[in-house]
Amino acid sequence: MTLLLLACGLLAVAMPGIRPKPMLVAAPRWFVRLAVASVGLGMFAIVAALLLSTSVGALHLMVGGAVTPVDHLAPEGVFGSAAAAAAVVWIVGRSAVLASRAARGHRAARVDAWLGKHETAGDLEVVIIPTDASVAYTIPGRQPQIVISEGLRARLSADVLRFVLDHERAHLRGRDRWNALLATALETAFVFVPGAARTAAALRIGLERAADEDAAGGLLTRRRTIARGISAEGVRAHIACGAELWQFRSRNLVDPAPPALPDLSLAALGVTAVSTVGVLVALHASADFSPYLALL
């Protein structure tokens, strides 16, 4: 059962990284939603499989031999259980380090009242910091901030500057910080999973594309003006995510806005199929938990 559950998890994690470009172009926000669901399911299935294998190995140590009623749940044996236990320790340790770093980084990135120019814009604060470097990012929380540099604001036209601010607002509305953290967890704590890096990269690109579409709107002339502006800035400064990604984003803003509800049947079918198989495997395994309870 552990092998089947692990296979479901590996497939669910890898799926968003398999030919993601069509959905990144046509339906970036829906790509993010489906990718987060698939990755979350995959990570859960992988951890469940590793814990199940570790538990069977622990039972072997406790009783000093084979445990026939549950051995079929983890056929990989003692060495497999030991490897699973090591993987669990790795995942927990890396996740704890990542959570600590994310919390420290969030606190450090918030701009104090004495630095820069602070302007209130609805329920958030726009902060202009005194630097010529190209800087634009958000700080979520009870008092969200959009931080932008004086140099970037001076170089952008009014339309492009508004797009940048709306782009950052879209990140706040979409709670994209948590999705970005999920991508980081995937490529650090689950680094041993094939395709994890590709999926994490696709998810990050999807977050940027989704915010672009939310901010750009449907007016084609405005979209093309924005595309020219961010393309020029990306080539000049290589900011945020590299020149290639800036060019990819600007090329997709030249075209008309994608439909609000595209055809997602194939992607949804894949996520549903893997979810169903994983749930069935877990339910089948749960029917054999009585030996664990008998040892309590």
Please place each PLM-identified region on the residue numbering.
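Juxtamembrane boundary at the C-terminal end of a transmembrane helix
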Residues: 1, 279-296
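Loop-to-helix transition at the N-terminal end of transmembrane alpha-helices
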Residues: 27-41
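Select subsegments of transmembrane alpha-helices in polytopic membrane proteins
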Residues: 37-48, 267-272
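Hydrophobic transmembrane alpha-helical segments in integral membrane proteins
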Residues: 1-11
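Polar-ligand-bearing catalytic/cofactor-coordination segments
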Residues: 14, 18-31, 80, 84, ...
